[in-house]
Amino acid sequence: MKIKAVGAYSAKQPLEPMDITRREPGPNDVKIEIAYCGVCHSDLHQVRSEWAGTVYPCVPGHEIVGRVVAVGDQVEKYAPGDLVGVGCIVDSCKHCEECEDGLENYCDHMTGTYNSPTPDEPGHTLGGYSQQIVVHERYVLRIRHPQEQLAAVAPLLCAGITTYSPLRHWQAGPGKKVGVVGIGGLGHMGIKLAHAMGAHVVAFTTSEAKREAAKALGADEVVNSRNADEMAAHLKSFDFILNTVAAPHNLDDFTTLLKRDGTMTLVGAPATPHKSPEVFNLIMKRHAIAGSMIGGIPETQEMLDFCAEHGIVADIEMIRADQINEAYERMLRGDVKYRFVIDNRTLTD
């Protein structure tokens, strides 16, 4: 079936309207009318081939929310009319250790929502900057937020799970001091989630202008990471630091703030590498630097349910489909609080 979308034909061209083809639903598939799709910084990286390997035409978008309009005859979990979401994963091998553990995000054969080879047919996946999508029911997620919050739920499908998964894995909660580095699309979700988990949350920013905003998001303290005295006041005090910054920076500035056995987890993906950390800083206090990538389907559903229970959504700015290129430029300037979301109904205008 032909539908309308917005995508790029090359790394050097702006995004533009295009028609794409979706498969008809199979026995286990769910067909979704997309209401909103979040704009992730990784969309920009992929469209401009900054991470290499982009296949064109590229239709980005992996923060998808909408309503079920049809299901295959073997689908058991969903019915037409259900509010659902689709995140970064639309398929995996389903039988490896990672898939059996509900960690499809680490499956060697995970299929991304866009720019991945399609497993059962020629071509590559096309994402949520489009009117509809067809996905196997295993990778569809139930949304329990009220309808009026649906647009602000969209970024939870990437920014939400990207921050929730490491916070859960490293046991953020009451009695724990948690740092969040960066107050952008990822960082603002990290602050909200760590606060809701009961941790003492310290936000790190290089911008004085973000100090009050960070407190409004739930930070107990805010530190200007360019202020040596403010940083020194927190030496050896953090159980866990969630580093959301994608730009290369000095990781040693933050590892020295960890307690013995503390961990800093990186979720921002820089286009060029960070400077190598000072190994002795890690050795002397058994510090760890780790990475984390989104989350599996069960954990993503857990995150959505947690957010619905605690009234958590992203802070968003709604845009039309014809404003995506402008939104990309604004995103590069840091001119968004904190996530753009496309109103997919404007694809027909």
Model-derived features: where do they sit?
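Glycine-rich Rossmann-fold phosphate-binding loop(s) that bind the pyrophosphate
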Residues: A159, G182-L186, A269
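Adenosine-nucleotide cofactor-binding segment
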Residues: P174-I183, H195-D253
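Rossmann-fold NAD(P)-binding glycine/threonine-rich loop
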Residues: A269-K285, I297-M303
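C-terminal hydrophobic helical "lid"/dimerization subdomain
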Residues: I3, D252, I297-D349
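NAD(P)H dinucleotide-binding glycine-rich loop of Rossmann-like/cofactor-binding domains
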Residues: K77, C93-V181
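Glycine-rich beta-strand-centered segment in the early N-terminal region that forms part
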Residues: R23-C37, E50-E100, N105, L126, ...
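Short N-terminal strand-loop motif that marks the start
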Residues: M1-V65, G127, Q131-V135, Q149, ...
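Helix-to-beta-strand junctions that scaffold the AdoMet/dcAdoMet cofactor pocket
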Residues: L258-R260
